[in-house]
């Protein structure tokens, strides 16, 4: 298959936490897919499951496991779910590797999540260990540290440091831990940021 003829993937058309424009792109992508198969007939259960998945995908991108779970809740048997998932994948509407990549980029950039938290979120969504590892590899140690420092620096501006910053440091380390940053990195980032903030206030 040539590059120009390949199915459009999720990453081509939608960001997991992107703008309204990218959501509109996903909806347009879903709308362009026929409601009924074009090559061979299927039973009504397949058609119903297919339509249901398309409706779910108009709100946001989803993993294969998420859609399979939603179909199971509706009482669809495994063989129906498997056929629908394969068809969605062929249409470029379900791609767990693309989903994981977009999820990590978005949650790290906009929500400040560390790699541990991101790994847990991907597991919850049914992303395989292989796809999760590939997506998380986008964030190297320096990038993760830099994002943690941004979060801490922003919070420190409004902190009371009358006690030398002891209470503030505890709160900030706890905040980073909740966002999925390792303890060692959290302590180091907070220590450096606190020293810089004290210097800034002394000069001011």
Swiss-Prot record:
GO terms for biological process: regulation of DNA repair. Pfam families: RecX_HTH1, RecX_HTH2. The keyword Cytoplasm applies. Gene3D superfamilies: Winged helix-like DNA-binding domain superfamily/Winged helix DNA-binding domain. The keyword Lipid biosynthesis does not apply. Keywords: Cytoplasm. Residues 1-22 have a biased composition (Polar residues). GO terms for cellular component: cytoplasm. It is found in: Cytoplasm. Residues 1-44 are annotated as: Disordered. Modulates RecA activity. Belongs to the RecX family. This is Regulatory protein RecX. The lineage of its organism: Bacteria, Bacillati, Actinomycetota, Actinomycetes, Mycobacteriales.
């Amino acid at each position: 298959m040539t590059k120009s003829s390949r199915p459009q993937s999720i990453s081509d058309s939608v960001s997991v936490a992107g703008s309204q424009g990218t959501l509109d792109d996903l909806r347009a992508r879903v709308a362009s897919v026929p409601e009924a198969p074009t090559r061979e007939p299927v039973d009504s259960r397949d058609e119903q499951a297919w339509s249901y998945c398309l409706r779910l995908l108009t709100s946001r991108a989803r993993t294969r496991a998420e859609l399979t779970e939603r179909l199971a809740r509706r009482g669809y048997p495994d063989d129906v779910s498997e056929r629908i998932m394969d068809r969605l994948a062929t249409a470029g509407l379900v791609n767990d590797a693309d989903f994981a990549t977009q999820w990590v980029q978005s949650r790290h950039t906009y929500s400040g999540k560390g790699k541990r938290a991101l790994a847990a979120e991907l597991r919850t969504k049914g992303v395989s260990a292989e796809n999760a590892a590939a997506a998380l590899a986008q964030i190297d140690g320096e990038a993760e540290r830099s994002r943690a420092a941004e979060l801490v620096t922003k919070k420190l501006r409004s902190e009371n440091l009358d006690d030398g910053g002891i209470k503030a440091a505890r709160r900030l380390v706890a905040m980073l831990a909740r966002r999925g940053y390792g303890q060692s990195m959290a302590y180091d980032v907070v220590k450096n940021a606190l020293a810089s903030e004290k210097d800034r206030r002394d000069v001011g």
